[in-house]
Amino acid sequence: MNPLQSIQHNITTPPISGGQPLDAVGPQAQKSHPKRISPSQLSQSAHQALERLSANAEHQRLASLVRKALQDGTFQFQSSNHTQVTYKASICLPADTDTVRTDLLINNELTVKARLNDQSEYDIVSAHLHGSSKAISFDVPSPPPAHGSASSVLSERTHLVMSRVLSQDAVDSSRLETSLLSSPDHSRPPSQPKPVHLGSVRRESGSLVSDNPVVQALLSFAQADQAFPPQAASIAGVQLEMRPRRDIEKALEEFKGAFTVEKAQLMSGANSSERVDEDVNADIHIPLLLKAIERGAAAFGPNASIGQNSAKAFLASCAPKITSNDDVLSEFINQKLKGDDDLQVRLGAQELLHVATKKEFQLGGLAGSIGVSSILGSAWELGASELLKNAIFGKNFSPSQYALQLAGIDSVPPLIIESMDTMCVLAIIKGMKGEEWSMSDLLPKALKAGAISSVVSFPNNVLQYAGFKSRVGDLAANSVTTEAAIFGAASGIPPEVKESEELMRAGLFQSMKDGVMAHPGEGVDTKKTIERMTRHALDIAPGESTAVKSMGLASIVGMIPLIASNKATGLLSEQVLRIFRSAVFNPIEAIALNALALGGRVNVPGLFDSDNAKHARVVQTILARASQHMEAGDRDISAEELHQMLAPRSEFLRHVGSAIVNGMNASFEAIPALVRKLGYGEAPLAERIPYQDLAVPDTSRQPAP
């Protein structure tokens, strides 16, 4: 093997049509070429190519060499044919730069090949610098062709490629060509998805490092048991990207469809030993993905499949692909990932989970809520209320004398306003979950919430006309009744969250029974396991998690009118407060839902993380665990550890909202529970899940091997 191998920088123009060069026409075939070529003889596209190279520090050295040789007149004519002419120059490379490694230098010749266009100017076709160890690639668009001639077509697009050919000591006489893109975004096809994680890579103390934590974790995994090839990231400006391998949103829909549990075998309401198939249509894709991140392929049972593919193979196909402007680097890492099925499953699950938990702004629902609440609320607060009361009690009536009647009148509008507003709020939650909804499904829930709001708002309305003599006592009573009114206005949310929780539990139970999800293990409390999985999933699910947090936010913001009123600080007049109640207080749930969706995109280091930052930490943990434990069985991430990354304990609004939702659901369930104790009614779905059945495998639903 030759220890001194030629390493070249190339600037090339790819063939225009079918890979075949065009025959010379016009001046190209007629004119003789000068012995020396100067800058004035170059076309505008050639100058633009050199200027584009100069814009990057890594490219500047080579562009300078070409321009200097042109200015000095050292490019001398060598040969020509029907399509191009060749010029060469002998150059002296500076000794204080690592642009060329002198120990690998073969010669110091700079070769330029050019083509004469129909304007008698030269377009650069290629340039070769022998002896360089650098490798870059560059695209430069040329100006539109003039006169439509064939020679002008050649200058429509000038493609500048600088590539290197490096020797590999491990492979006799083999050579690797690395094309480095000056800008990943510049060369990305329009249809190619943007990278999820992107970082620069450099060599440091013999290893490859990156300032991006996720990319650094990927590099650590790749070089955990094998060093990178010496030619990988051997120049500055190397970037590494993790980008989706396939259409992740489409893949998520396939995953959701495959793992939606339509029916579950539950206990009969009349006989607990009897099992009945009940429609649940339970969506369990988020807890499944969480479990796949925690345990890899071990999360699934023998019957977990998506079409003709196993769940393991499907998730592995969703793992991100690694791209780089250094082909040696990306090829090495992709080969490492390809040989690690467990890691691909976990990374694929994380890719899907990232999309599954993405919170989208719901403009339609917000506009509907503000329109209904603000318009109807303002019409009542600023006009209709006073007109109606004056018509009934006279213009100079005493509010304290008719406190109960006036409070009753004020409690009627919430029945209408909150019913319509709850429709919008539930539509927002359904939209965030990506679920279809119909008016017939939401209307009963909305009317129930409107009725609750109307009843619960009555005590607060009474205190607006007949308060306590004690200022402190009056403020305390108003605080309690105001919070009750807020909860009543949002009474459509807690039952929606509870319904999702019960259906998910039933779905997880059935998936374990059917061998889709792996059994928790012998001696493990399956009920507690399923309850924990459900809680962890709903804490990050886009619809339910945002709904719960919105309850916490509404309970705080909803107190502003009371605090600013003359019952407390007196900061705002009653007229202003009426407008505030109409514009903000009434549609507070819809505003909170969308504000929280947008807030998930904000990242403030040290205070709170964006959703993207949380998922990046999960990817980093998956890769770090793989680096520490090359065996798949030792890489498990605990459920609590993963939950802490995605739903930190510091999420104040989640804790407040959860307490409110659980408390409201308990109060809603109090009377039905009492009725059931008297022997009437059917037990709720959550109480009819036969967790004890999971102790015995259900072989009747499992296919024969």
Swiss-Prot record:
It comes from Pseudomonas savastanoi (Pseudomonas syringae pv. savastanoi). Effector protein involved in non-host recognition. GO terms for cellular component: extracellular region. Residues 1-15 have a biased composition (Polar residues). This is Effector protein AvrPphDPsv. Its main location: secreted. Keywords: Hypersensitive response elicitation, Secreted, Virulence. It comes from the Bacteria. It is found in: Secreted. Residues 1-40, 175-205 are annotated as: Disordered. GO terms for biological process: symbiont-mediated perturbation of host programmed cell death.
